[in-house]
């Protein structure tokens, strides 16, 4: 999975978010909190998902900006995994009265999305699908399996779209082969 490491990715994200948040905080003269979805499942592979990095990044932000203390950092999943994020999302959807499947079918975890062109289109039209074989997709599907819900995202492989049960079976085989 180290092939998916983008050097300094979360620092880049946090720099952009911090600058916007600080601008809003200064304009409104209020405290602004930013949230990041970094989680424990990524600690081993992505150094910028660790608490030590977050602390150092926030300290640098505060040292380098006037009134930076007006921006707070919220990382609720730092000690959790994709399943914890999914459980929280399910709970939030219930509280807000919104359709979980409608929300989550519009999300993407895949590092290898697959574009399938419409056969009738000569203008490049088509649909994007998530792969189900990359590590991030396997972790996502595993979280849905643990939650006991089908993942509403549409999956595909090199042959075309596949039903969720195919993606689920693939992940279950991987988990079984690793004794999980």
Feature locations, PLM:
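Nucleotide-activated chemistry modules centered on ATP-dependent adenylation/adenylyltransferase
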Residues: 1-180
């Amino acid at each position: 999975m180290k092939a998916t490491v983008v050097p300094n990715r979360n620092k880049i994200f946090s720099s952009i978010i911090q600058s916007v948040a600080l601008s809003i905080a200064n304009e409104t003269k209020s405290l602004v909190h930013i949230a990041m979805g970094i989680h424990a499942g990524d600690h081993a592979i992505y150094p910028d998902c660790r608490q030590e990095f977050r602390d150092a990044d926030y300290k640098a932000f505060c040292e380098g900006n006037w009134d930076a203390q007006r921006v707070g950092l919220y990382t609720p999943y730092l000690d959790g995994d994709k399943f914890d994020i999914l459980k929280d999302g399910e709970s939030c959807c219930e509280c807000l009265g919104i359709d979980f499947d409608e929300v989550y079918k519009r999300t993407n975890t895949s590092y290898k999305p697959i574009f399938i062109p419409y056969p009738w289109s000569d203008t490049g039209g088509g649909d994007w699908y998530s792969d189900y074989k990359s590590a991030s997709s396997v972790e996502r599907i595993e979280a849905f399996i643990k939650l006991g819900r089908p993942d509403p995202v549409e999956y595909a492989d090199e042959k075309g779209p596949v039903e969720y049960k195919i993606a689920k079976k693939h992940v279950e085989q991987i988990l079984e082969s690793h004794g999980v």
